[in-house]
């Protein structure tokens, strides 16, 4: 069968299901694909297919994630669902599946549970910008007051972690009913349709990566006689044009330069765009002024920092991580984009040590500055071996 052409006419949005184990995340994921296939003509995916999610690797960490897609009238959605709680933690911290918005699934019969809270906290830490709530299993709750109570609890919990709890859309329904094609009291297919319409209206269209300010991590530096210095790398975001002023940020003092040429596959171009591997020719920059690990950016868009708070996941022994816990003052290397920088960790109050397999908030101080922003992902390494992953939650200095 020939591969279908990817439809670029609809804007593309990344979402995912989060919430406590057995509250119905995977059932809702399957129901979304079913309802959208009937209403908007995308393909349905069976529950079992999603539940036996394949393994994938992100930053040296194995994660089980199921990716499905569905369409609404106005958008194409890529949706990620994880089978286990540990997979969620790893997924969100490594950014393996970046989400423009999350669907928090909470059982109306049980109300918020420990992982409900933890997933909301993680969403805040890793910068998931929007959450929509689906109160699931509402067909099992006869008491309208109980539904109201659970709704209030969920709103309070969202507000606790700085999400707009009072204004968050909450859809009440039954994913199982929708998956079976039923719709008693509009709790099945109607509720799931309403959820899709809510995703359309509540989660804004993400800024396209080419519209963001230019940033390219420097992987290599060459000097070409008679032409000057060329830095190569994969453009992370934005566009660079010939004659653009640029800054080189990180590891040393920030320097200013100008792009005098863009090269890809030995051809000269007028511009380089996000996602492309290219060489950027720099005017007035010496070969020794630049090194791998710095970034080339639009002036003023990114600053170098050495101190930050991060949410980290520490690999378990089985995943090839450490065999022993670490304590405050732990000094591994932090691998940002293209280079390692040594840093020391302070643990939160009341936390004596961090065990392999844990996730925890730490404060990090690096020995050299790195170009960083909230949401930047990194790996934690010891002598080149990955022992953890993290995300910058808040810059301190």
Swiss-Prot record:
The Enzyme Commission number assigned here is 3.6.5.3
Q: Does the keyword Iron apply?
A: no
Enumerate the residue ranges of region (G2).
Answer: 60-64
Report the principal subcellular site.
Answer: cytoplasm
Q: Provide the residue span(s) of the region labelled G3.
A: 81-84
State the residue spans of region: G5. 174-176
Which SUPFAM superfamilies does UniProt cross-reference here?
A: EF-Tu/eEF-1alpha/eIF2-gamma C-terminal domain (SSF50465), P-loop containing nucleoside triphosphate hydrolases (SSF52540), Translation proteins (SSF50447)
Q: Where is this region: G4?
A: 136-139
Reactions catalysed according to its record: GTP + H2O = GDP + phosphate + H(+)
**Pfam families cross-referenced by the UniProt entry:** GTP_EFTU, GTP_EFTU_D2, GTP_EFTU_D3
Report residues binding Mg(2+).
26
Entry-linked InterPro entries: EF-Tu_GTP-bd (IPR041709), EF-Tu_GTPase (IPR050055), EFTu-like_2 (IPR004161), EFTU_2 (IPR033720), G_TR_CS (IPR031157), P-loop_NTPase (IPR027417), Small_GTP-bd (IPR005225), T_Tr_GTP-bd_dom (IPR000795)
**GO CC, any one term:** cytosol
From the UniProt entry, list the residue stretches annotated as the region G1. Answer: 19-26
User: Which terms are listed as keywords in the entry?
Assistant: Cytoplasm, Elongation factor, GTP-binding, Hydrolase, Magnesium, Metal-binding, Nucleotide-binding, Protein biosynthesis
Q: The tr-type G domain covers which part of the protein?
A: 10-207
Q: Where does GTP bind?
A: 19-26, 81-85, 136-139
Q: Where in the cell is it found?
A: Cytoplasm
Which molecular-function annotations from GO does this UniProt entry contain? GTP binding; GTPase activity; guanosine tetraphosphate binding; translation elongation factor activity
Give the function comment from the record. GTP hydrolase that promotes the GTP-dependent binding of aminoacyl-tRNA to the A-site of ribosomes during protein biosynthesis.
- Quaternary assembly: Monomer.
Q: Which HAMAP family match?
A: EF_Tu_B
Family label = Belongs to the TRAFAC class translation factor GTPase superfamily. Classic translation factor GTPase family. EF-Tu/EF-1A subfamily.
Report the protein name in the record. Answer: Elongation factor Tu
